[in-house]
Amino acid sequence: RLRDDFFAYHQSRTSLFLKNIRKKSYTEIIHLPDPQAVRDGRTVVAFSDILHGGTVYYTTGEFILHLENIVSMLKKYENIHVCLVSGETDTRYMVYAKRDVGVIVAKTSSPPIILAINEKNMTAAFWDYLTHMAGDKAYSSPNNRKIAKTLSDYIRLLKS
């Protein structure tokens, strides 16, 4: 029953997301982990710490499927964009922001905590932080073709 409820919820969220991206822009900031970390099964599935079963890690095949889905969406939807960041990133939290609306900050390490913020100045500060992290040029002038190629090259590296 829980599995069916979760699947129905997932389908509903996916459907709403696909409807929204026809009209609104969506940008994800991604750090590609070291390929060996992926092969060794050390890449954490986002938000898996929040579930009662503990942290869940991608298999190499699952991570490849995830990236292939991103590449497919970059090619199919003009309002979806990805900014790749280099260097180390803190994986203990995730930040979701909607400009002029609000921010969700989720601490993904144990114990998990989720904060929803809709105060105007805080939202603006997080928005500035995220656009700076993505790179102002990469954010304001996204190049989906270039990012799709970079992700495809990374996928080939994982498969080799």
Question: Each predicted region: which residue ranges?
Answer:
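Hydrophobic protein-protein interaction segments
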Residues: R1-K159
